Amino acid sequence: MKCLCCGKDIDKNGENGWHKSCIKRFFGASKLPEIEIDDETLKKLADETVNNGLTVPGVQKKLSLHLISENKSPKLTIVNFPTGYILKPQVPQYETLPEAEHLVMSMADITGISTVPHALIGNNGNYAYITKRADRITNTDRTAMLAMEDFCQLDLRLTQDKY
């Protein structure tokens, strides 16, 4: 079995498909955070996010998540701002889309292209793609947005032509 974060072999001591060291590096926690988002909640929240102009509409729904630790049990929760992670769950139209995105990002890592930290995480019996937000700088009184490019932009395609 391979770690869902780094892709290296993992033994039976791995937690839900992750090395303990990968959990610490990615989440800053000693335990893999809990996450439970059903399809109905996902659709509702993703639609709200698009309608509020917080993300671009597309095939792959995106949710902003924040990591909280209550009673030493970390959880990824759905919040507006500040957010620390982006979750992209499975979509019915394209099987294994989160796995494909993680694969492409891992290939970029191997070839020396700088990427944001990324991994797969279990969600309702499927995998979801999760990435750390690197496009925001948050301090005590405000959040600044940084310009970022994706592979669509690097190919000089417009966002509406992405899918």
Please place each PLM-identified region on the residue numbering.
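Regulatory N- and C-terminal appendages and interdomain linkers associated
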Residues: 1-41
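Conserved ATP-binding subdomain of kinase catalytic cores across diverse folds
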Residues: 42-162
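Short secondary-structure transition/capping segments
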Residues: 32-33, 161-163
